[in-house]
């Protein structure tokens, strides 16, 4: 007991001393061993530290614990401290985070326990504070000698202090589930010559996913609290024996310890390891010198595993953001301000340096599993002043132990950073030439790294930028040596060689004068491109404003913090190099997962901030939309030159883009803009524009590309013209053509292309014409299934000679269409298309579907000839010599090959059997089936066709459906060359006539006949003007330009064309016997026209429709297609190139109203032939028609001759006899024809004429004679007389009633004969009217023009030429009770130019008898009014006559008009009355008349 007492007293004395230190205030006697002497030793076991007094910035220390702590004190002053198992638990202070992590802490169990124990802790804290105040007062009253002795003891102890700790761990509670652990295996502190040396080993940072594990070490908290309250605290020594603060605060610590989280070893992820750390510093020598200075840190190797940080990345970013927010105010402190530092430098005020240097041998950054970045020999040194210098000697980039980063050998470090003492700016240098090799494997890993940490980088950049806004950013100047980036591919490598780079952070990120692009093949390097003056700039405050455009080509502003500007980009390489690079790039990109498996995740519909910017420009305020972008790249000029294209047969190609902008908005939508794009061909010093500007405003872009992160890309093109020359097809090498034919199925990616005011220019193969397709607006959609094209309108223009094309104006012609712009260049508009839809299906067999709502073609004879020849010449015909088309030489036949050696050997004859050898056949009970038409010719033909074998695999299907087609034929001539040739021919004839030479008719362009003048009065030019424009001119000039209105209109409805193309391949030669019945089908074509009409619009013709469908009596029946054509192009011998045509044509019954002038116009129109457009082939080929079948065609023909060519009669043209007779409803039938072996279409015309003409003259003469106008009434009367007998007989045979049958026959007779009598009367009255009008014309009257008298109506200052209509006097009292005011009831019919169209007397017939009477009264009154007007004018002239001779002349002129005009009125009134009477009993005749004759209403609409 006596030995125990001193030891117990020692413990309590030491315990009293330790309890005065707050950290060890929880030490208990059970955990303390004391041994005092010359080598005093103190041992502590399992000590829970009182950490509530530890104050760390932004961190709460929850608990602390030491498993073992040994303290050795020697009399000589040595102090040795060793320990093991030191553990601290920390967490961020409350509200440290401003995100969801702080809410987790707010709702945690720890917060609840702390709030619950707050009241218990307040009383204890108060008591302890009172004792500490008393103790401080006692200490303060101690003498100063004690202070001196204490300081001396501490100085001796600190001077010989040694520390060694093992297994040190800091647990940082990031959240209730994640714990970050920082462990150190060993720490050793030694003091040598007043220098402290700290060695640390086995440093490791890890994190774990944990669960709550509350401790239960203190259970009797209530009793401890009660004991604490009843304890006498007067004597502190006694209280130290019987009382421990750990017991009083057990409830508080139990709540804190409940936050210690437990985790298994499998859940721990190591993110950082440090091999060895050596720290040397000075300071901490006495109680008055506790500062640390001259610190040098040496680290052997650091390994950072970036991939393993991903689970706690969110927590680390939150800590970083919170730390920046809480320390951002430090930048405004006086000692951190730049002005204060400058003041220190000027006043030579030096601060004591704490950190001197940090030296790291190696830092290994493990970016991914196999991707590693090593930094070797890193040095950070504090220089005299305010900045730090740094250097990195070398760098290595490794992937799977393969090195990708190389630098030139040098003794200098790779990176170095030096401070600028004068400007307090930093300068960083890259002291070596470096090379970075990138292959697809490494790029895949880098893209994975960017994808994984891109969002984190953007977040860090965002929060650091927000922090930097509150203080002035430091300036860092960077300068490098040459940098080479090498992209390794399969067969080649691409190298980017950069000149020294400069940058001034944070404003200028990248600045290089030149970047060279080299192609490496083996040991050979070729320069293929250069980039000049690339500058990348950034702004920490504010944004760059870049003028750009949206997809509607409207001006916008792009606001961005990062902007790159490239002065020029120029690539120059050959086609072979381009193909090599393209193939390698395609393979390279195909091996990258980001390209083969693009990220299709939708990032949500983020709303990009859009605002309006008010700009003041030219005293006008306008709004401009603005958008935010992550970056903007501006390229002033980009150019690419491809040399030696198509084996140097095509020349060089130059692609040029000016003022390009590339940007990416916050939705990751990539937008590219090109203001001006051009593609040129250079061959033999001649430049040809392939893609060029067509009437486009240069202030707006021509190309806009939008590529969203999710969704289809969209390309917008405006004002671009594409030029294609058909001759370029010959420049393609034969090997390439074979590759094109064998090309596999095309695949398209989803994309939308919109065209605005674009055009396609086509130049044919042999002739010099030019065709332009103008596209005002179009939408093209690409998809894996095919292509869809839709547009509202399209226009085709043509020029006859590209050599006379006017030079394009550089100035933009505003407010005009693209078609008008081309017309100013010399083109003529010919075709206009409305609402077109085209679909290209990407299947095994190519399918094209085209739907068009309306096609309007307006042509003259010369422009139609040029258009057809141009369309044929766009794809040159493939012609072959006869040796390839036909088998000229017979094949050698081995006649002995088919001889049978046993031919003469006697064999058993089956016919030699006897009667017994035959069996009796069974008797069949079935009936005999007779096959009809067994011997029919048609059936034999079908069988013959079926006997042949053919293989037709469809490779191409084209379907075209046009709802409405209009072909307008204009008189006159479009091309200047045509007009010039005609004028020259006329001038030559006129000169020869004036010289008295013998003249004959001249023919120009195979269709224009110029007759020789008969006398000096006749003027050829006036005759031509009268024929073309139907007008009289005395100017002496020829008017050969196209007429204002068309002469003939060909109108079709529902035109359907279906084309099926097969394999166009020459088969291998086979034996003659095996291939005698084989043939190859190249293509099938099916054409169907539902309705077809030809409208006659010649001024000299009174008829309306030249051709139309015959009306059927069955109105309920569905009308078939008017024209159906089925054609097949075959190759009869598969191994030869000769082709033949098989055609079948079906035509419905037709009605023709043929006027001789119209027939002559159509004949000459389609006969026009210009030698400039003649297509000459090397081997001319005439289409051979193997078989042609035309079904029987029924015609209802009306023919009106105008003149007779007597010269043709004399020469033997018997067809001229037709011009002596007028035909009215002649019924003609063209019989069914099947032709074989027709050599071309010219021969076909002759053969058909030789077949149909004799058949008509032999079998259909009676029908034609009955249609002659003089015999038409007699034929009608004879039909009525025949019906008087035939009709009763037929009815009597049917019902046996004689009375009713006789009555029916009488009705038919009366109707037929009555109608014919009325028609005859109408013809007589109309003929009489015509004779009277012609007589009046000869005597000086108005004649036919008197039907519509020209007058002048004055309205204000305008004079309108008009015509008096037949409804002039509708305000008369007989039909209208309103007051008579003729001037207000004039129906104005405008003239067609300077001439009037002639209307037939049979046009505009009244529908019934009452209408006939009304029209008769109006015509009579009109003619009487004209007579009265003529008499009134004659009376005025008589008054003004100067003599009797003049008066007699006036009366002689007026007398014929006064006498004949009333007779004309009478005949016209009688004709109208009879027409109304006839039409009342024949309602279908009105529709026939409207189709046959022109009307005044139709003339107004044309």
Curated annotation (Swiss-Prot):
Query: Is Transport found in the keyword set?
Result: yes
Membrane-crossing ranges are none
Q: Where is the composition biased (Polar residues)?
A: 211-222
State the residue spans of region: Disordered. Answer: 211-234
Task: Report keywords, A-Z.
Answer: Autophagy, Endoplasmic reticulum, Lipid transport, Membrane, Protein transport, Transport
Alphabetized Pfam families for the sequence = ATG2_CAD (PF13329)
What are the subcellular locations of this protein? Answer: Preautophagosomal structure membrane; Endoplasmic reticulum membrane
Amino acid composition bias (Acidic residues), ranges on this chain = 223-234
A Gene Ontology molecular function term for this protein is:
protein-membrane adaptor activity
Q: Provide a GO CC annotation, any one.
A: phagophore
| Reactions mediated catalytically | a 1,2-diacyl-sn-glycero-3-phosphocholine(in) = a 1,2-diacyl-sn-glycero-3-phosphocholine(out); a 1,2-diacyl-sn-glycero-3-phospho-L-serine(in) = a 1,2-diacyl-sn-glycero-3-phospho-L-serine(out); a 1,2-diacyl-sn-glycero-3-phosphoethanolamine(in) = a 1,2-diacyl-sn-glycero-3-phosphoethanolamine(out)
A GO BP annotation: autophagosome assembly
Lineage top rank: taxon = Eukaryota
InterPro entries from the UniProt entry: ATG2
What membrane topology is annotated for this entry?
A: Peripheral membrane protein
Q: Which family does it belong to?
A: Belongs to the ATG2 family.
State the protein's purpose.
Lipid transfer protein required for autophagosome completion and peroxisome degradation. Tethers the edge of the isolation membrane (IM) to the endoplasmic reticulum (ER) and mediates direct lipid transfer from ER to IM for IM expansion. ATG2 binds to the ER exit site (ERES), which is the membrane source for autophagosome formation, using basic residues in its N-terminal region (NR) and to the expanding edge of the IM through its C-terminal region. The latter binding is assisted by an ATG18-PtdIns3P interaction.
Q: What is this protein called?
A: Autophagy-related protein 2
Tell me what organism the protein belongs to.
Answer: Kluyveromyces lactis (strain ATCC 8585 / CBS 2359 / DSM 70799 / NBRC 1267 / NRRL Y-1140 / WM37) (Yeast)
The gene name on file is ATG2
């Amino acid at each position: 007991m006596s030995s125990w007492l001193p030891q117990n007293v020692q413990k309590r004395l030491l315990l009293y001393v330790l309890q005065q230190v707050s950290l060890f205030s929880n030490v208990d006697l059970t955990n303390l061993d004391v041994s005092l002497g010359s080598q005093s030793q103190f041992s502590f076991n399992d000590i829970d530290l009182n950490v509530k007094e530890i104050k760390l910035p932004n961190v709460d220390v929850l608990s602390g614990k030491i498993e073992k702590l040994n303290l050795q004190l020697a009399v000589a002053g040595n102090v040795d401290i060793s320990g093991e198992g030191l553990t601290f638990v920390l967490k961020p202070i409350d509200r440290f985070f401003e995100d969801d992590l702080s809410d987790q802490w707010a709702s945690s169990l720890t917060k609840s326990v702390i709030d619950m124990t707050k009241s218990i802790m307040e009383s204890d804290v108060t008591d302890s504070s009172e004792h500490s105040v008393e103790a401080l007062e006692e200490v303060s009253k101690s003498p100063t000698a004690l202070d001196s002795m204490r300081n001396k003891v501490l100085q001796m102890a600190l001077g010989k202090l040694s520390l060694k700790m093992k297994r040190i761990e800091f647990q940082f509670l990031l959240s209730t589930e994640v714990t970050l652990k920082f462990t150190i295996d060993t720490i050793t502190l030694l003091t040598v010559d007043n220098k402290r040396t700290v060695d640390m080993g086995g440093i490791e940072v890890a994190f774990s996913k944990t669960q709550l594990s509350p401790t239960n070490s203190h259970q009797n908290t209530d009793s401890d609290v009660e004991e604490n309250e009843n304890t006498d605290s007067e004597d502190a020594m006694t209280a130290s024996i019987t009382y421990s603060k750990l017991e009083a605060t057990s409830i508080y610590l139990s709540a804190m310890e409940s936050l210690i989280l437990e985790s298994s070893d499998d859940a721990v992820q190591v993110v950082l390891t440090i091999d060895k750390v050596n720290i040397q510093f000075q300071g901490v020598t006495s109680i008055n010198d506790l500062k640390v200075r001259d610190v040098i840190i040496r680290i052997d190797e650091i390994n950072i595993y970036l991939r393993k940080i991903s689970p706690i990345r969110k927590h680390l970013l939150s800590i970083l953001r919170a730390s920046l927010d809480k320390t951002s105010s430090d930048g405004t402190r006086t000692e951190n301000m730049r002005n204060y530092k400058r003041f220190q430098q000027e006043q030579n005020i030096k601060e004591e340096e704490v950190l001197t240097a940090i030296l790291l041998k190696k830092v290994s950054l493990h970016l991914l599993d196999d991707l590693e970045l090593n930094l070797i020999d890193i040095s950070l040194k504090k220089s005299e002043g305010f900045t730090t210098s740094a250097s990195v000697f070398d760098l290595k980039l490794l992937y799977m132990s393969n090195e990708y980063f190389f630098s030139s050998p040098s003794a200098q470090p790779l990176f170095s950073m030096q401070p600028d003492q004068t400007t307090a700016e930093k300068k960083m240098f890259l002291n070596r030439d470096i090379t970075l090799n990138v292959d697809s494997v490494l790029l895949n890993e880098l893209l994975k790294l960017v994808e994984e940490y891109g969002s984190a980088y953007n977040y860090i950049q965002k929060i650091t930028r927000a922090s930097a806004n509150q203080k002035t950013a430091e300036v860092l100047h960077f300068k490098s040596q040459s940098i080479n980036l090498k992209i390794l591919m399969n067969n080649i490598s691409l190298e980017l060689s950069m000149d020294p780079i400069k940058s001034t952070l944070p404003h200028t990120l990248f600045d290089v004068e030149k970047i060279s692009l080299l192609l490496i093949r083996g040991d050979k390097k070729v320069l293929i491109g250069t980039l000049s003056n690339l500058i990348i700039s950034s702004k920490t405050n504010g944004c760059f404003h870049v003028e750009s455009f949206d997809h509607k080509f409207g001006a916008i502003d792009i606001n961005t913090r990062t902007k790159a500007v490239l002065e020029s980009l120029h690539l120059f390489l050959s086609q072979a190099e381009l193909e090599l690079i393209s193939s390698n790039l395609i393979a390279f990109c195909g091996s990258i997962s980001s390209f083969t498996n693009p990220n299709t995740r939708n990032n949500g519909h983020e709303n990009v901030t859009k605002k309006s910017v008010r700009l003041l420009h030219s005293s006008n305020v306008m709004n401009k939309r603005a958008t935010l972008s992550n970056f903007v790249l501006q390229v002033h000029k980009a150019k690419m030159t491809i040399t030696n294209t198509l084996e140097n047969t095509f020349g060089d190609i130059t692609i040029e883009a000016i003022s390009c902008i590339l940007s990416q908005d916050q939705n990751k939508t990539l937008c590219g803009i090109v203001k001006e794009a051009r593609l040129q061909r250079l061959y033999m010093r001649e430049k040809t524009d392939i893609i060029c500007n067509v009437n486009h405003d240069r202030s707006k872009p021509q190309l806009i590309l939008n590529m969203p992160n999710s969704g289809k890309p969209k390309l917008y093109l405006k004002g671009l013209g594409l030029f294609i020359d058909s001759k370029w097809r010959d420049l393609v090498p034969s090997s390439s053509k074979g590759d094109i034919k064998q090309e596999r199925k095309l695949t398209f990616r989803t994309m939308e292309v919109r065209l605005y005011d674009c055009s396609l220019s086509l130049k044919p193969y042999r002739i010099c014409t030019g065709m332009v397709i103008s596209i005002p607006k179009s939408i093209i959609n690409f998809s894996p299934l095919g292509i869809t094209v839709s547009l509202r309108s399209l226009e085709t223009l043509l020029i006859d000679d590209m050599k006379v094309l006017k030079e394009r104006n550089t100035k933009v012609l505003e407010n005009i269409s693209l078609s008008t712009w081309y017309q100013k260049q010399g083109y003529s508009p010919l075709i206009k298309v409305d609402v077109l839809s085209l679909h290209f299906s990407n299947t095994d067999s190519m399918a094209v579907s085209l739907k068009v709502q309306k096609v309007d073609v307006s042509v003259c004879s010369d422009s139609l000839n040029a258009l057809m020849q141009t369309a044929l010449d766009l794809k040159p015909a493939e012609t072959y010599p006869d040796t390839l088309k036909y088998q000229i030489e017979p094949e050698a036949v081995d006649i002995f090959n088919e001889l049978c050696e046993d031919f003469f050997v006697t064999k058993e004859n089956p016919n030699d059997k006897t009667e017994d050898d035959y069996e009796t056949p069974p008797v069949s009970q079935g009936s005999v089936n007779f096959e009809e038409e067994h011997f029919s010719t048609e059936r034999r033909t079908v069988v013959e066709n079926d006997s042949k074998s053919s293989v037709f695999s469809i490779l191409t299907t084209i379907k075209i459906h046009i709802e409405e087609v209009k072909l307008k034929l204009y008189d006159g001539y479009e091309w200047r060359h045509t007009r010039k040739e005609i004028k020259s021919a006329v001038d030559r004839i006129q000169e020869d006539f004036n010289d008295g030479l013998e003249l004959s008719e001249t023919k120009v362009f195979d269709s224009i006949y110029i007759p020789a003048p008969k006398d000096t009065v006749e003027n050829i030019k006036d005759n031509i003007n009268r024929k073309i424009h139907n007008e009289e001119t005395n100017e002496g000039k020829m008017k050969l330009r196209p007429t204002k209105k068309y002469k003939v209109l060909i109108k079709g409805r529902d035109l359907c064309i279906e084309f099926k193309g097969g394999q166009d391949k020459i088969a291998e030669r086979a034996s003659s016997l095996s291939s005698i019945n084989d043939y190859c089908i190249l293509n099938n074509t099916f054409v169907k026209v539902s309705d077809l009409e030809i409208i006659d619009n010649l001024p000299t013709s009174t008829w309306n429709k030249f051709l139309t469908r015959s009306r059927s009596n069955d109105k309920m029946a569905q009308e078939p297609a008017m024209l159906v054509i089925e054609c097949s192009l075959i190759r009869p011998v598969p191994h030869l190139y000769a082709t033949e045509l098989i055609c079948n044509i079906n035509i419905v019954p037709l009605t023709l109203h043929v006027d001789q002038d119209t027939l002559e116009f159509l004949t000459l129109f389609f006969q026009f032939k210009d030698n400039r457009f003649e297509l000459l082939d090397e081997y001319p080929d005439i289409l051979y028609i193997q078989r042609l079948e035309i079904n029987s065609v029924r015609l209802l023909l009306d023919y009106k001759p105008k003149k007779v060519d007597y010269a043709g009669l004399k020469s033997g043209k018997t067809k001229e006899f037709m011009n002596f007779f007028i035909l009215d409803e002649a019924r003609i039938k063209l019989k069914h024809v099947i032709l074989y072996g027709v050599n071309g279409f010219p021969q076909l015309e002759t053969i058909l004429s030789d077949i149909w003409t004799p058949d008509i003259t032999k079998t259909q003469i009676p029908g034609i004679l009955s249609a002659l106008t003089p015999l038409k009434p007699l034929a009608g009367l004879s039909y009525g007389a025949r019906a008087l007998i035939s009709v009763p007989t037929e009815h009597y045979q049917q019902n046996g009633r004689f009375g009713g049958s006789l009555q029916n026959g009488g009705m038919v007779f009366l109707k037929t004969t009555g109608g014919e009598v009325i028609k005859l009367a109408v013809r007589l009255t109309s003929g009489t009217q015509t004779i009277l009008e012609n007589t009046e014309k000869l005597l000086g009257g108005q004649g036919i023009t008197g039907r519509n008298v020209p007058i002048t109506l004055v309205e204000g200052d305008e004079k309108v030429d008009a015509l008096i209509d037949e409804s002039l006097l509708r305000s008369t009292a007989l039909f209208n009770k309103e007051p008579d005011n003729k001037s207000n009831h004039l129906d104005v019919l405008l003239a067609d130019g300077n001439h009037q169209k002639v209307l037939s007397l049979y046009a505009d017939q009244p529908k019934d008898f009452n209408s006939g009477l009304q029209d008769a009264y109006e015509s009579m009154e009109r003619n009487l009014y004209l007579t009265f007007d003529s008499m009134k004018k004659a009376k005025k002239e008589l008054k003004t006559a100067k003599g009797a001779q003049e008066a007699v002349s006036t009366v002689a002129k007026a007398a014929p008009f006064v006498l004949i005009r009333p007779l004309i009125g009478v005949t016209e009134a009688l004709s109208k009355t009879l027409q109304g009477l006839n039409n009342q009993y024949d309602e279908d005749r009105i529709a026939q008349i409207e189709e046959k004759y022109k009307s005044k209403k139709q003339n107004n609409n044309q």
